[in-house]
A protein has these predicted regions:
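PLP-dependent class I/II
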Residues: 2-18, 24-61, 72-104, 130-426
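Short beta-strand to alpha-helix junction loop
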Residues: 116-117
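Glycine-rich loop-to-alpha-helix module at the N-terminal edge of alpha/beta enzyme cores
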Residues: 83, 106-111, 124-127
């Protein structure tokens, strides 16, 4: 039954009559509020639970985010310093905040935006990215706006993946990619990145993680529909542009992850299907924050924001990684972004440590994560969450830290991590 936007759920239920022209369900929908006939029907269908979840969401093991939150709530060390999740510990630039406030006063910004996004934002993105692509982007046909980069990825997969199509992703991957690909019926093929062989004993550039291209070539086959590259890359030729979708996030760019403003750039013959899928998933995206993001893109260069952002993030990375140098813990030194992987193989966990069963059954990095939260009060993310079980061994000695926090938070985290000294065996 289709419910139009003017039809409330309660009205729709009231219109659904039994043969006796009486509502089958009372106003409340939980089982104990069903009327006697509904309860009888429920009893006869007990073998086929009418409230059973779909397979795409059922039977999933506990995700890393809820495990970290559980550990943080139970830790005797409070408050926890959250260095795990990649949210910013500070506000967007003032020109972006001011633009968001001003947008709320505009009538048109408080109503539905065009399904493909507000024209001002699409123009601002086209202007910002045209130099990088080496061509003048058409904002009407080569840019579309989505509700965050994650929904943009889902729209791209929904727009092109049919059941049985294969998508290649590299490990480590963002865990949302899995459900985004599987929902339209795609099959995932995995190719891992390999750390340097001496990564447990030497701090090395993150660029030394490498792809086995022979392994990649063997994975490509006639069913391969897409390859996902979760890394900054340059478009090297016009031919590559014609078959590439680039996904971006205004929230990540301007320290505003809660805004959920994403975008895709690509040729018209690809973008139109992504936009079509987006329209059917959520119709349109948040209008006032699109306007704010447009102003932010327009003013970023003039305000020197991009250069300042790169400089400040590099300083934060260097500041935080001082603790790893001090503890002689090797790490993958990133050349961009705000995540760092530290190799914790020298941290020896007590053999009798009381890990809960759902942590004890997971790879070593989950135990390291739980241990850090409970013993020193610092939260990190176990990167095997971003690997298949077959390749989890590659990352089980690492932990991921996010440095996009205020400097005082970084200093507190460093001081607490010094508590690991007594557990380190070189």
């Amino acid at each position: 039954m289709f419910l139009g936007h003017r039809t409330s759920i309660s009205t729709a239920i009231a219109r659904f009559k039994t043969p006796a022209q009486q509502p089958l369900f009372s106003r409340h929908t939980s089982p104990r509020f069903l009327d006697p006939r509904a309860r009888a029907m429920s009893a006869t269908t007990s073998r086929a639970d009418p409230f059973r979840p779909a397979k795409r969401v059922a039977g999933q093991r506990q995700d890393v985010w809820s495990i970290v939150n559980e550990a943080a709530a139970a830790s005797p060390v409070q408050p926890i310093v959250n260095m795990g999740q990649g949210f910013f510990g500070y506000n967007p630039p003032q020109f972006a905040i001011d633009a968001a406030k001003e947008a709320l006063d505009k009538v048109e910004c408080n109503q539905y935006s065009p399904t493909k996004g507000r024209p001002r934002l699409k123009q601002a993105i086209a202007d910002a990215y045209s130099p990088s692509f080496g061509r003048k982007l058409n904002p009407d046909t080569e840019v579309t706006i989505t509700t965050g980069a994650n929904e943009g990825m889902l729209s791209a997969f929904m727009g092109f993946i049919e059941p049985g199509d294969e998508v290649i992703i590299f490990e480590p991957f963002f865990d949302q990619y899995i459900s985004n690909i599987e929902m339209p019926g795609g099959t995932i093929r995995y190719v891992p990145l390999h750390p340097p062989k001496d990564g447990a004993t030497r701090t090395s550039p993150a660029s030394e993680w490498s792809i086995d291209f022979e392994e990649l070539e063997k994975t490509i086959n006639p069913k391969t529909r897409m390859i996902v590259l979760n890394s900054p890359i340059a478009t090297l030729s016009p031919e590559l542009y014609e078959r590439t979708l680039t996904v971006g996030s205004a929230g990540k760019a301007f320290y505003a992850t809660g805004w959920r403003v994403g975008y895709l750039i690509g040729p018209e013959h690809l973008i139109k299907y992504v936009a079509g899928a987006h329209t059917r998933i959520c119709y349109s995206s948040v209008s006032p924050l699109q306007e704010a993001a447009a102003v932010a893109f327009e003013q970023a260069d003039k305000a020197g924001f991009w250069d300042e952002s790169r400089t400040e993030m590099k300083k934060k990375m260097e500041r935080f990684c001082e603790i790893f140098d001090e503890l002689n813990i090797p790490y993958s030194d990133p050349e961009g972004g705000y995540f760092v992987l530290a190799n914790m193989s020298s941290v020896k966990l007590p053999e009798d440590y009381p890990f809960p069963p759902h942590v004890a059954s997971r790879p070593r990095d989950f135990k390291l994560c739980w241990f850090l939260i409970h013993e020193v009060g610092v939260a990190a993310i176990p990167p095997t969450e971003f690997y298949t079980d077959a390749n989890a061994h590659i990352a089980e000695d690492y932990l991921r830290f996010a440095v996009c926090k205020n400097d005082d938070v970084l200093e507190t985290a460093k001081e607490r991590l010094r508590g690991l000294k007594k557990y380190i065996v070189q």
